């Protein structure tokens, strides 16, 4: 078993390069042999991630660095290129039908990009890829299709502002849908126009941006993403129900 530490990536006045480097120094001193840059919401800025990778590699060249970045806001391919050019050793990818959307970039695209950049990367066994693709699609059709929100296959730049990870978008949209019904019933009684899901989604993202610094800028990964999202939802419901 290899001891690995994950640094959860986010953007805030607290989460500077020096902040992350200090944590990396501590966990390496405690025995970590690998560092994973866990960009769970895909909001890590490519240049920042490249600089952090280089800082760790320059000081601890023996440490394996892995990049785990989700595709949701659309920065992941640029981030992969930056971390690889600065010494990253491992990149997390996905295959169809689960790649892209709120998941990871597809391994075919990543390999193509890295080859063009001059990296030596293994060829893909396309027969194995297509077999795994078909098996995964069959499993989704039989079971997971009941649970996967189609919106999870869509990338959205809106995620950059709120910093919420794509993995919780399904539950958040379900919560928002139920809340919308309650809010619109109240608005209807007052003679006010109904709010669309887009109206509420933007208001929720704005509320997340308001709540997040007030709870200490926690990286929005489980369970903190749920805490912040739920506080924002309750605030939004209270605002609309009270009319203030």
Where are these regions (language model features)?
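Catalytic cores and adjacent flexible loops of soluble metabolic enzymes
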Residues: 1-244
């Amino acid at each position: 078993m290899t001891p690995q530490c994950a640094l959860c990536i986010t953007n805030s006045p607290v989460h500077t390069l020096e902040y992350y480097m200090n944590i990396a120094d501590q966990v390496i001193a405690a025995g970590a042999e690998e560092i994973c840059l866990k960009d769970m919401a895909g909001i890590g800025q490519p240049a920042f991630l490249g600089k952090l990778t280089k800082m760790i590699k320059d000081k601890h060249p023996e440490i394996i660095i892995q990049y785990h970045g989700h595709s949701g806001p659309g920065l992941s391919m640029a981030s992969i290129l930056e971390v690889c050019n600065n010494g990253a050793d491992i990149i997390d990818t996905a295959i169809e039908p689960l790649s892209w959307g709120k998941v990871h970039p597809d391994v075919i695209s990543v390999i193509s990009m890295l080859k063009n950049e001059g990296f030596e990367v293994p060829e893909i066994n396309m027969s194995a890829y297509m077999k795994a693709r078909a098996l995964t699609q069959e499993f989704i059709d039989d079971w997971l299709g009941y649970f996967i929100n189609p919106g999870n296959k869509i990338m959205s730049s809106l995620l950059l502002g709120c910093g919420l990870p794509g993995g919780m978008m399904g539950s958040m949209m379900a919560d928002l849908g139920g809340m919308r019904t309650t809010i619109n019933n109240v608005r209807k009684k007052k003679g006010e126009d109904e709010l669309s899901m887009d109206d509420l989604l933007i208001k929720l993202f704005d509320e997340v941006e308001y709540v997040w610094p007030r709870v200490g800028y926690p990286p929005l990964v489980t369970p903190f993403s749920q805490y912040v999202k739920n506080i924002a939802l309750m605030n939004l419901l209270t605002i609309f129900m009270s009319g203030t």
